[in-house]
């Protein structure tokens, strides 16, 4: 019966991920992961045929363009100019999720990459059930329900980002590390290796698991040392691959696509971030989340210590990080939020049993069901189930460009640069990467190379474009667009300005 119930919970989350999935390559993160998945798939495909190819391909226009810092203007959303291959681009995001997506791309094309999301969501729920079952089978099942209903899980499982995959891998690593089976330390280390590849900055979580294995009280010292050493060796490949990849992409094993550590981290951020993360945790998961703090008294032991220490380490890693104001950045704590939810269920169950309350199973189950309903309601009040509709503009605009613009179109855009490349296969140029004095000359340059320039904006970007290029007639953007898509995206043809001034411009095409 519990197996059927768990399958139902897993299936519900998977269906949610598919039904409401915002499976578009549009934003910075999503295009970063999906585009790199295409590159890794290309590398794997060539290797399977006994050939070698590189992850970085130089863009000829970036090599030849005459304006300052030209490479930056040809780096689409989610990418930066490569410091190691002139004229190429590199992702800002870690390689782990893209590598996981690559086999799906090989099997079913670029859009198949999105199917890793429900799979990782299923792994997250299943692993939570296993870890929770260390406190009892009932706790395992009920905690998996809470995780599947968590607002931040629901918000992230429908997006092509690494948060749910990272959480799934860390929970699976904990599930294996807390197992009594002979090869559990080895398997936990291998999963940790994958988790590090997915989110390299969370290496300290792996150290926490290693210390748990080293200090596990129910085992002898030889067993502890053997388990910890096995775990450490199995975790090492992920660290090595990260170092090699980052060295190839950014010129150093310790560099990343997000920028310098000095720019990203400061102790001055700690207070602001502490209030934000704890506040978001409370507002999304109700005051019940505080019950996890009672676990050391009601459920003393290694598993409780592991869960709380991992959460504190996860929190500490992000306290000095850049301050964000949107609740969705609670996703940074997603790898360990399931551990808190397990402790919440375990504390309720243990408290009822300690006070010998009749009907413990029914009361605990009812409490968790109520919490789950509150969680889902909270997720609905946030834009969780509207993301698919809100981000559909990326796909619609990209498809329009592919269907209606000529093959030699070069699209000057910014936030839509990834979607134009992914759905239309057209070259892009970032207007906010151009020197303000170079817009007109950039248009002349791309025409001289055989490309027809188009301008594509989200409506909110038009004012910024005008302000950036006040000295250019094209920069005024004072003629109607050739097309408006989903009432949010506009496409302009620079040549249409003269037609408009002479009264010969055809009307704007409105695309729903």
What positions do the PLM features span?
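Signature aromatic-anchored transmembrane alpha helix within multi-pass, membrane-resident enzymes
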Residues: 1-9, 138-141, 190, 232-240, ...
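Transmembrane-helix signature of polytopic, membrane-embedded enzymes
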Residues: 2-4, 128-150, 167-168, 177, ...
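Multi-pass, polyprenyl lipid-linked donor-dependent membrane glycosyltransferases
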Residues: 28, 113-123, 142-172, 177, ...
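Hydrophobic/aromatic-rich transmembrane helices and adjacent perimembrane loops
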Residues: 33-34, 163, 198-200, 204, ...
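Interfacial juxtamembrane loops and adjacent helix segments
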Residues: 42-97, 101-106, 265
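Membrane-lumen/periplasm interface segments of multi-pass, membrane-embedded glycan/lipid transferases
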Residues: 72, 76, 225-228, 243, ...
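Hydrophobic, aromatic-rich transmembrane alpha-helices
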Residues: 123-129, 282-308, 347-350
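Membrane-embedded, lumen/periplasm-facing catalytic core of multi-pass transferases
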Residues: 370-419, 447, 511-512
């Amino acid at each position: 019966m519990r197996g059927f119930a768990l399958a139902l919970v897993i299936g519900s989350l998977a269906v949610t991920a598919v039904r409401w999935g915002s499976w578009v390559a549009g934003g910075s993160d999503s295009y970063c992961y999906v585009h790199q998945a295409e590159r890794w798939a290309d590398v794997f495909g060539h290797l399977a045929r006994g050939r070698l190819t590189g992850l970085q391909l130089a863009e000829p226009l970036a090599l030849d363009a005459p304006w300052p810092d030209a490479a930056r203007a040809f780096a689409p959303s989610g990418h930066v100019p490569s410091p190691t291959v002139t004229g190429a681009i590199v992702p800002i995001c870690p390689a782990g999720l893209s590598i996981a997506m690559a086999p799906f791309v090989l099997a079913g094309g670029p859009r198949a990459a999105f199917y890793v999301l429900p799979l990782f969501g299923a792994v997250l729920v299943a692993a939570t059930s296993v870890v929770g079952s260390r406190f009892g089978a009932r706790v395992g099942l009920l905690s998996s329900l809470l995780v599947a209903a968590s607002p931040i899980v629901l918000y992230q499982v429908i997006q092509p980002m690494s948060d749910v995959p990272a959480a799934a891998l860390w929970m699976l690593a904990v599930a294996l590390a807390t197992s009594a089976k002979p090869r559990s330390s080895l398997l936990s280390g291998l999963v940790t290796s994958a988790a590090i590849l997915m989110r390299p900055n969370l290496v300290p979580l792996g150290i926490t698991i290693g210390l748990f294995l080293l200090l596990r009280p129910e085992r002898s010292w030889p067993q502890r040392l053997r388990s910890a050493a096995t775990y450490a060796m199995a975790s090492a490949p992920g660290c090595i691959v990260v170092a090699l990849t980052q060295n190839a992409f950014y010129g150093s094993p310790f560099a990343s696509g997000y920028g310098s550590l000095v720019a990203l981290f400061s102790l001055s951020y700690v207070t602001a971030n502490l209030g934000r993360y704890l506040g978001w945790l409370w507002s999304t998961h109700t005051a019940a989340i505080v019950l996890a703090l009672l676990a050391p008294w009601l459920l003393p032991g290694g598993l409780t210590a592991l869960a709380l220490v991992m959460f504190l380490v996860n929190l500490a890693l992000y306290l000095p990080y850049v301050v964000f104001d949107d609740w969705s950045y609670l996703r940074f704590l997603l790898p360990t939020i399931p551990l808190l939810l397990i402790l919440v269920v375990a504390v309720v169950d243990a408290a009822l049993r300690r006070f010998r309350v009749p009907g413990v199973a029914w009361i605990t189950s009812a409490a968790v069901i109520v919490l789950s309903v509150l969680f889902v309601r909270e997720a609905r009040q946030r834009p969780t189930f509207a993301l698919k509709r809100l981000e559909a503009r990326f796909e619609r605009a990209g498809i329009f460009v592919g269907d209606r613009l000529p093959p030699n179109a070069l699209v000057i855009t910014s936030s839509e640069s990834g979607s134009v490349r992914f759905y239309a296969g057209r070259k892009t140029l970032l207007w906010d990467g151009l020197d303000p004095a170079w817009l007109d000359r950039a248009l002349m340059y791309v025409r001289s190379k055989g490309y027809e320039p188009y301008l594509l904006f989200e409506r909110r970007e038009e004012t910024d474009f005008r302000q950036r290029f006040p000295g250019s007639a094209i920069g005024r953007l004072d003629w109607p667009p050739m097309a408006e898509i989903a009432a949010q995206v506009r496409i302009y043809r620079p040549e249409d300005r003269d037609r408009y001034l002479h009264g010969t411009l055809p009307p704007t095409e409105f695309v729903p």
